């Protein structure tokens, strides 16, 4: 694919919308939103969802503090709705080429996931990519020397696990890398294990490609060579899981953005890396681009 065709696929965003609530963790998505807005030539907006008009003035004041502006600033939006995710997406639909950028502060498992319930609900209903700042972006580990400003490293890491679903977002990841001027690295985290004793027998990994992982990423590199020039691939062998493996990789090889593909299963957001994908948001020290998979891959 030539450079002109790649530019046609590049994401275009005029607004970056940050959902706010009453916690400091929601406000902590603002630096990431500003970095995205600077790259896209966009403006940062906020949205808060309340159950009553009586709260509107107080909430607008909160949005003003987050944006360091006046409460009458038109970039501050307040939706009245008992359904937070519906209010956020309704606001996003009214804005010009909007990108939702949110934070999640969940540090423990709730309902089988490491993603907070409100963030999970917003992601579940998204039909376009959403950027999520996880707890290590919101509240960085002081001992992590790889931490940089949001999008401060020109490298995008796209996570795959050997399934068609996980690879469904690679075209979007490549377009984002091109638009942001980042190098694209495709990473798979695999449990180290010996090959099957019998030729043709299935692999039995707990996580990672159910085949030779090095051969798998070599094949991906060949497939995507024209569409993503300069792409490189990495296999991270980790016996514990996807989250710890990716976290160690990012500490040794910093990135500005991580991408993972998501899908819905029975109306519960099920990321294609299973629990490992929720671990990625939870464990990543950089924002995560969550890409909805096409329906045919879910």
Model-found features: residue ranges?
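Small/aliphatic-rich secondary-structure junction motif
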Residues: 2-58, 63, 68, 72, ...
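Glycine-rich phosphate-binding loop signature in dinucleotide/nucleotide-binding domains
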Residues: 93-97, 249-255
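Intrinsically disordered, low-complexity Ser/Thr-rich linker and spacer segments
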Residues: 138-154
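A short acidic, glycine-rich active-site loop
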Residues: 204-215
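Glycine-rich, Arg-bearing micro-motifs that act as flexible, cationic patches
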Residues: 103-125, 140, 257-283, 293-298
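Charged docking surfaces used in two-component/phosphorelay signaling
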Residues: 79-86, 236-245
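CheY-like receiver
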Residues: 36, 87-91, 245, 249
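Hydrophobic, ordered structural segments
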Residues: 47, 78-80, 85, 92-134
């Amino acid at each position: 694919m030539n450079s002109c065709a790649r530019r046609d696929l590049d994401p275009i965003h005029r607004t970056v919308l940050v959902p706010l609530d009453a916690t400091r963790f929601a406000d902590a998505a603002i630096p990431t939103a500003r970095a995205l807005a600077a790259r896209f030539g966009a403006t940062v907006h906020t949205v808060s969802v309340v159950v009553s008009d009586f709260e509107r003035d107080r909430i607008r004041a909160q949005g003003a503090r987050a944006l360091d502006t006046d409460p009458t600033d038109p970039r501050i939006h307040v939706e009245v709705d008992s359904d937070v995710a519906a209010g956020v997406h309704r606001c996003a639909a009214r804005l010009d080429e909007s990108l939702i950028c949110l934070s999640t502060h969940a540090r423990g498992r709730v309902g089988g996931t490491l993603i907070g319930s409100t963030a999970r609900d917003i992601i579940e209903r998204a039909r376009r990519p959403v950027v999520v700042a996880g707890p290590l972006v919101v509240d960085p580990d002081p001992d992590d020397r790889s931490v940089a400003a949001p999008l401060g490293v020109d490298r995008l890491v796209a996570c795959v696990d050997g399934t068609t679903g996980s690879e469904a977002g690679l075209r979007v990841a490549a377009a984002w890398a091109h638009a942001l001027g980042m190098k694209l690295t495709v990473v798979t985290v695999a449990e180290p294990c010996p090959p099957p004793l019998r030729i043709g027998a299935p692999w039995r990994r707990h996580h990672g490609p159910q085949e030779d992982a090095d051969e798998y990423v070599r094949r991906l590199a060949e497939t995507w060579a024209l569409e993503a020039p300069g792409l490189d691939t990495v296999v991270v062998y980790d016996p514990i899981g996807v989250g710890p493996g990716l976290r160690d990789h990012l500490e040794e090889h910093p990135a500005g953005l991580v991408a993972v593909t998501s899908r819905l299963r029975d109306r519960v957001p099920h990321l294609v890396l299973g629990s490992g994908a929720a671990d990625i948001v939870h464990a990543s020290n950089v924002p995560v681009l969550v890409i909805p998979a096409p329906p045919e891959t879910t």
